[in-house]
Amino acid sequence: MLDDMRVLREAVREYCVAATAAGLDWPDAGESPAGAPPDRVRRIFDVDHVADQLAWLQSQRWPDARLLPNGGWRMPWPDGGDALDYLGLSIGTPFPWRQQLPLFHFDFLLYTFVLAGEHEGEIWRYPVGEDAWESVRAAPSLAALFDQWTRGIAAGVVRYGEADKWLLVEDVEGVPGLDPLAFPVTPVAETLLHARQRECGASPVADDEGFEHQERLLDAIDAAKARLAG
């Protein structure tokens, strides 16, 4: 869903404050107004608009650093069609594979922002570089995601690591009020994964069918990139 802008601003501000208090080096640059997203974004992802919530988040003057749990970072607006390559494992989603923007990268997981339709504003997660068919919603909205991370810091399961200089996620399962799928950790319990997939409308893919689905998706990605380049 798309957050009320006041709710989103407050959720992001609270996360920034909590992350800084935990030890993360995050100078306060103040809030920036939302800038217009590049025209190419709509063309790359085949949508007719980009949500104000996403435009606002991308306009914030964050340092070029790993500010998110487990060393994740915010990805910039994409430059071209190669951004679609990130979506090669988005199999079984209840929305068109192309209508999502890669937003947060965690080395081994990718979080995307759904750009259109009834799932607009949701955050979905996919494994990176693995033959794993685990498409699932991480959070119903940006504000919900940042709120979970802030709660994780408060609960002591997201803490600053002196060696890496970023926030580390410890065991979040069983902690009251925390949703393990909101946190960039893997693997997750299959019972939780499958229950969330049913809840959010994802279609689980059997291991022996995953490669066939992925091959078709990769062909679609190549075709979309060719049209963008033409």
Enumerate the predicted regions with their spans:
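A surface-exposed partner-binding patch
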Residues: 1-113, 183, 187-190, 194-230
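Long, low-complexity, intrinsically disordered segments enriched in glycines and aromatic residues
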Residues: 60-178
